């Protein structure tokens, strides 16, 4: 895999909250997206999802509580766990799903 700048890649994406696959390591897909202030409805997946913020912050609603993930932090969403994006998230998000 070549050297990647997640912040640079996300700034080039035409649409916020639409991820782009930038690589794969074994079964894990690595995606990047640009966050904006919008909220997004609750969702869940049948796979684990690591949410790594490289710039800005991600505000999540999980099990009735708010979790803020800051730059340099990662939140692991276990398979089947409902989670929503709360208003005010912004920056660059790297998603690793297995």
Language model features: what each stretch is:
Residues 18, 28, 36, 65, ...:
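A generic "binding-loop/recognition-motif" signal
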Residues 26, 54-55, 70-71, 89:
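A cytosolic small-molecule/anion-sensing beta-strand core signal
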Residues 79-98:
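Ligand-binding loop in jelly-roll beta-barrel domains
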Residues 29-45:
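Conserved short histidine dyad/triad with adjacent acidic residue
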Residues 64-80:
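Short acidic-glycine-tyrosine-enriched beta hairpin
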Residues 1-33:
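A short, N-terminal "cap"/entry segment at the start of jelly-roll beta-barrel domains
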Residues 37, 47-59, 63:
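Glycine- and acidic-residue-biased ligand/ion/polar-headgroup-sensing regions
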């Amino acid at each position: 895999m070549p050297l990647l700048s997640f912040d640079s890649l996300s700034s080039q994406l035409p649409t916020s909250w639409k991820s782009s696959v930038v690589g794969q390591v074994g079964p894990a897909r690595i995606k990047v997206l640009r966050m904006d202030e919008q909220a997004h409805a609750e969702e869940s997946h049948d796979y684990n999802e690591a949410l790594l913020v490289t710039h800005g912050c991600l505000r999540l609603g999980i099990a009735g509580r708010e979790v803020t993930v800051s730059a340099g932090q990662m939140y692991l969403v276990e398979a089947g766990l409902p989670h929503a994006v709360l208003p005010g998230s912004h920056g660059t998000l790297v998603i690793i799903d297995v």
